């Protein structure tokens, strides 16, 4: 990542995946709920629960409000999620454990809650979503192009999938948050010739 104040590119080693990412409350491992090496953790299925999530935002961009500006102002819907507990095997990991809520239908993560070594809630992630076929999900003004466009071909009509709209983390112990209003721009590749084993 290029850091303008240093006029340098900072390379991010995969070995520091549980360290703070560029001064934010995120780590490399935290993106999308979990973005690490599964074998470096023990996993437990906790159960299923219904939670309120932003599964289909009504806005083009994430709208924040509230006393700290951390809450997402949008349409919330009830979704059934499976909850898994992630327990790091390495004692030097900053979290004692983390719960990840995964949508039963789409497989998308909406929330994650990390706890410190004392068992106190430390960080909460919220991932808001949009759908690929929403009218405002357009990158070039001419039509959606989410990486599936290959040689002028778009994904078959009716291919509808979720994209993240924001990745937000609230550090409850330090009373701060990192809000990342962004949009996922990649989609499953529909070209079977490019599929690798």
Please describe what each predicted stretch is.
Residues 181-197:
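Long, C-terminal catalytic modules of enzymes
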Residues 1-36, 69-184:
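Gly/Pro-enriched, hydrophobic low-complexity segments
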Residues 33-75, 80-82:
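C-terminal amphipathic alpha-helical segment
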């Amino acid at each position: 990542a290029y850091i303008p104040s240093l006029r340098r590119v900072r390379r991010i080693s995969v070995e520091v995946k549980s360290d703070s990412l560029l001064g934010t409350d995120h780590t490399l491992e935290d993106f999308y709920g979990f973005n690490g090496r599964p074998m470096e953790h023990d996993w437990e299925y906790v159960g299923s629960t219904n939670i309120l999530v932003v599964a289909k935002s009504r806005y083009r961009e994430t709208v924040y409000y509230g006393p700290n500006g951390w809450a997402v102002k949008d349409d919330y819907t009830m979704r059934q999620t499976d909850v898994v507990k992630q327990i790091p095997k390495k004692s030097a990991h900053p979290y004692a454990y983390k719960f990840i809520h995964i949508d039963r239908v789409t497989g998308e993560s909406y929330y994650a809650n990390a706890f410190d070594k004392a068992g106190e809630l430390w960080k909460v992630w919220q991932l808001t979503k949009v759908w690929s076929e929403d009218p405002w999900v357009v990158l070039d003004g001419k039509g959606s192009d989410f990486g599936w466009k290959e040689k002028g071909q778009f994904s078959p009509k009716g291919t509808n999938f979720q994209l993240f709209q924001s990745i937000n983390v609230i550090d409850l112990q330090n009373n701060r948050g990192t809000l990342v209003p962004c949009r996922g721009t990649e989609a499953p590749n529909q070209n079977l010739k490019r599929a690798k084993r």
